[in-house]
Structures are given as C-alpha cells and as structure tokens.
Amino acid sequence: MAKERRRAVLELLQRPGNARCADCGAPDPDWASYTLGVFICLSCSGIHRNIPQVSKVKSVRLDAWEEAQVEFMASHGNDAARARFESKVPSFYYRPTPSDCQLLREQWIRAKYERQEFIYPEKQEPYSAGYREGFLWKRGRDNGQFLSRKFVLTEREGALKYFNRNDAKEPKAVMKIEHLNATFQPAKIGHPHGLQVTYLKDNSTRNIFIYHEDGKEIVDWFNALRAARFHYLQVAFPGAGDADLVPKLSRNYLKEGYMEKTGPKQTEGFRKRWFTMDDRRLMYFKDPLDAFARGEVFIGSKESGYTVLHGFPPSTQGHHWPHGITIVTPDRKFLFACETESDQREWVAAFQKAVDRPMLPQEYAVEAHFKHKP
C-alpha cells in the first residue's frame, strides 16, 4: 500500500503545472507541501519548513504518504494553488527564479502563503502606495561603515532620496527613478539582506549599498522601487504592454568578478580590477564595494563595429593571468586577462550576448554620451 501511495504521488508530477517548483519554477520538484497541495524543489522546501503553521512538507520519493494526503495533493496541485495564492500579484512584483538569493525566495513564499498578500490587495500597501520612507543601513562611501540613514521614495517626484541627518532639510542624494536599478548582492555586501542600488550621476554610475535587518522590509523596498519604475515607464512608453515593461524594472548583472586590465597604450602593466557587466556597461572598480567605477566601457552591437575575441594581440606583455580577452570597439581595443579558462568562457559569453543583440534607439544615445575612460 505504501508503495502504491508513493507511486500515486509520483504520477501527480506528470500533471500540467506540477513538473516545476510552484514557487521558483525549478524543474523536477522532489518535495511537496501536503497542507498547501503544491510540489516544490529542495531549496524552497527548506523555506516551507520555517512556516510550519502554514506548510508541512514531505519528500515525494522517500517519505511515507497517507491516503488522505495523496487525495489532497490530487485535488489541489500547483495550478490550483497559483490560481488562489497568486490571483492578485501586481505586475511589478518580483517573482524569484531558481538562481535568486534565499531572501527573495523566502519573502515570496511568506507573502504568498503566510501573509496572503496576493489574495488581499490591501496588504500590498507597503510597496504599492507610491510613497515610502524609513531607515536603512547604508555603507559609507569612504570609510566602509554602515550607518542608519533615512530614505524616502516618492513616485510623485520620480526619485529615491536619502538624508545624512534625521533633521536635514536637504537630501544628501537624489536618485532619479528613470536611471535607477536595484539588485540583491548578499555575498558582495556581506549581509543576507544586502541590496545594491545604482543610479546615474553626471552620466557615470554611482553605487550605494544598503540593507535592513528585517527581510520583509528590504524586499518591500525592492518592490516599491520596481513599482516606481513601472509607473514611470508606463508614462514614458504609453503604448507598451506590461510584458514589455516588466523586464526593464530591475536588472541582475550579466557577470561580475576579477580580471586584469591594461591602459589604452597597452604598454602599461596589467592591474587586477573588479568588473561588473550591467546590460551594455562594463564597469571596473578597484574594490567591489567602491561607490564609483574607475572606468566604464560601452559594449555595442556587431553592426556598430564591436567584436569580442579570445586571447591577446601578438606581443602583449605584462599580464599575470594567462587567459586573454580582446574587445574591439570603434575607438580602440580593450585587453583583459582572466585567471581561469572557465572565467574567460563566462566573460566572453556575457560580452557576446551584448554584441549579438541589435542596439535600441536609446542605446545609440547612451553610446554617443558615453565617456570612454582610460
């Protein structure tokens, strides 16, 4: 009997919607919540275990199943749960993928099943109201210390602002929603709730690093920023549908890591730098947590004269790392050295993705304004 029940549960995985994790979309889920009636992956099952008042989990393959539990799974399933628990997810709300950090997945799961934010829209006020203020820990630009700072997000002004003192009349910085991006970077920032916010200042990218001790708070900030971007883009591109706008709300970096670089004459020694590939901007920093990039390189499309090559030009000297990459732009060549072959492969793939993609009209404007820094 036990074997038959387990086989019955396994057969339910073949039903439409059940072949991927109900929460992050990972293929071939091996776990199930027998109180919610959903099939989930191993990673998400760990989060479900932390909300036992809502969800109780079992291994599809290894645990014993009772008849009533099998029947419950059969009468529910991922599609039914989605129809109930995700019926009112705002278009701008970030839905995590298998590669996202633990925090995003945990808050998505808690929002769905524990707080039921997508059944009762009034619970979405913290990120849907168009205005948000509160205190966040912000990393100091020069000393690297995290200090509590007041942040204000106002859609009416199209800006995120922060203040150095509680009683300050003027903000220390005003970040325009138009050019703002936010991406979770727990490992780099050294905090599980670490968020990196970038914006353009004088056409150069400025980084700020923030976190909040409460996971819900920082994810609410993240989704409030996405909501502000969504509403800004709806006005800027009135003909565009949600499907066109949602991918533009926030970007994860295509690739980050250390490479060596040399200057424009290619006679100087190579220096180790931290590189971030953000859409078509390749930025390099002395330290991963620097506020400003030392330089930025725009990577356009092959139609505009950009090429990526494996290796160095002949007679290149001064690099400590053996695996070379050459980026050819209409102005000059940029040389980079990677420590490992797999690093080189990943960087070339990231660059190639940008080069193979035709440029949008607004990207030509960015290219024209771009400062090619040595």
Swiss-Prot record:
The Gene Ontology CC terms held by the record are:
cytoplasm; cytosol; intracellular membrane-bounded organelle; nucleus; plasma membrane
**Which tissues and organs express this gene's product?**
Expressed at highest levels in brain and at lower levels in peripheral blood leukocytes.
Domain PH, chain residue ranges per copy: 129-230, 252-356
Q: Which residues carry this modification: N6-acetyllysine?
A: K272
Claim: Secreted is one of the keywords in the record: no
Q: Which residues carry this modification: Phosphoserine?
A: S87
Q: What is the effect of changing R273C?
A: 70% reduction in PtdInsP2 3-kinase dependent membrane localization. Almost complete loss of PtdInsP2 3-kinase dependent membrane localization
> Zinc: is it a keyword of this entry?
yes
Briefly, what is this protein's role? GTPase-activating protein for the ADP ribosylation factor family. Binds phosphatidylinositol 3,4,5-trisphosphate (PtdInsP3) and inositol 1,3,4,5-tetrakisphosphate (InsP4). Regulates the incorporation of CD63 and CD9 into multivesicular bodies.
Its protein name is: Arf-GAP with dual PH domain-containing protein 1
Native species of this protein?
A: Homo sapiens (Human)
- Name of the coding gene: ADAP1
